[in-house]
Structures are given as C-alpha cells and as structure tokens.
Amino acid sequence: MKTDPLADLERLANLKEKIRNAHIEYMIAISVRKVAYSKIIQESESTSNEIITELALRNAQYELMETLNSEDFERHKAMFQAHNHNWAVRELTALRNCFAGALFVDLDNLIKGLSSIVNKQCAEANIGIEPVKHKQAGRAITNNVRLGAAIWAAGNNFRHFENWPGTPDVQPERTAIGSINILRDLLDFECFNWNVCGEVLALIAKGRSVEQLFEDFQQIGRDLCDVPLQTLDKHTERLLIQVKSEGLVNEEHQKMLAANSI
C-alpha cells in the first residue's frame, strides 16, 4: 500500500512518542492499542501480521476464560494470569517492532524525497552509528554503518521481511541482499524472515535518547542540502535556502518533498 509519509510531519512526532512509551515503559493501554493497530495498518506498507497474530491469540485466551465456571476459573486463575502476562509481553514486543518499522518507513521515504530533490544519495551523508562488535573471527567491523543506510535497511526489512528467506541457506532475492547484509553487520545475527526494527531502534538509541535519532536525521537533511546551489533550479534553490534558515518543517517544503517522494 503506497503511503504519503509527508502528509503530516506531526504524525512522526506522535509515532515517536508511542515508540518511546512502548520501548521504555513497556505499557500501553488497551484503548491506545486499538488506535495503534488501525494506525499502523493504514500508515505502513507492512501487513503487520505480528500484531494481528498476537491479538488473535490473546482473544482466543479470553474466550476460553469466559467458558469456565467460577470454580474452574479460580483453580486456573494463577495460570491464566501468567499466560496473560506472557501474551502481553509478546504483544507489546510485536507492537514496538511494528511502530519502529513504521517510523523507519517514514524516515526512509523522507530521505529518498530529499535525495531526489538535491540529486545526492542519502548514503553520502557523513553520519554513522556504531555497529555491534562482532565476536566471530574474520568479521570485525572497522567502519561505522551510515545512519541513512541503517534506516533504509530497516525500512526494507519492515516492508518485505515476510518475503525474505526463512533460513540462511536460501539465497535471498537481489533486492533484499543489501538490506540483509547491513542488518547482519549491525546486529550480529542472521536477519532472515524477521522484523528486527525494534532492535535497530534500540541500537541507534543506545546510550542516548530516542530523540537523538531525530536530531541525527535532521542533520542528514542539512547535509543533503549542502550542495552547490548553481546545480539546482531556482525554485528548489529558494526552498533549500529557506530550509537551511528555518529548518525542515515548513509547509512549502513538505509539499515539495511529498511531490518528489518515492
């Protein structure tokens, strides 16, 4: 499902706050979850099967509880409470990963829009994140993975992870190889058939706040704007000057990015 990630930049801030709450506090009210489910399904390019599966399992558990008489319920109450806690943790983990994935899809599309405007690849932005240090011999990482590349790989993972190979023995599709390699280097485990966006978000925010991700992302935007203005048309030149002086969030720039988003 094609989405317009730039229709409302305020949505990114709201989504960021939900991610932060789910990831750090690990608790979201049932009423908020219902909104979150519909929001993710509408705004992401993923089918969000993780969330749907966990929700179905929990609903089945509640239906079973309702069929028990009071004596059976009391006898199995402790067991149900334990199961309920486990399902809640699993559901919130899936929710956190899907929220993180939706964020990466938005950021990836926005970076692509910026890149198309200034005719410069986002991978050239001189911003990196420190990968996990590999323990295996011969797999030491010497260079940081660029933040733009990590966002791109995580966005692709969320969009298409269900179509990636289920085991390392199966050769992935050509379009997935680059993303899988980046995520493997970042996380130090095989990233096949799994949504790892929550782990990528935690890695990027390690030792810092999640807000730092947005500061780094805005720096990518500033770097992308740092190109010779004589190579741009007059309208884009005026927009970039305005962006540099006022920041990324202004109505005219949003429309320009939305028109050029991929």
Give the residues covered by each predicted segment.
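Acidic, Ser/Thr/Gly/Pro-rich intrinsically disordered interaction regions
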Residues: 1-57, 63-97, 134-262
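Eukaryote-skewed repeat-based solenoidal scaffolds used as protein-protein interaction platforms
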Residues: 90-100, 104-118, 122, 126
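Short acidic alpha-helical/loop segments enriched in Asp/Glu that coordinate divalent cations
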Residues: 114-134, 166-171
